[in-house]
Amino acid sequence: MNKETQPIDRETLLKEANKIIREHEDTLAGIEATGVTQRNGVLVFTGDYFLDEQGLPTAKSTAVFNMFKHLAHVLSEKYHLVD
C-alpha cells in the first residue's frame, strides 16, 4: 500500500462493507460479509459462499467471491484494522 490508511474497528468496517454490497449494482440477495481479517495490508472478507450439499461452489458462490474481492480492493486502500 502506497497511501496512508485510516484505522477502523472490525464492526464499523463490516457495516461499511455490507452497505457497499447492498448498494452495488451487481449484488445478489443474501450476500453479506460476516467477518474480516487483515493479511499483509489486505482486508480479507468472509461470509456464506453458498456451497451446495457436497460443499461445491454454485453460481452464487462466484458472485460472493467477486464481491468480497471488490471489497478487499476498495477498502484496503482506505483502512487498516484495529482491535
Swiss-Prot record:
Domain of life: Bacteria
InterPro entries with a match to the protein in the record: DUF2498, YciN_sf
Name of the protein described by the UniProt record: Protein YciN
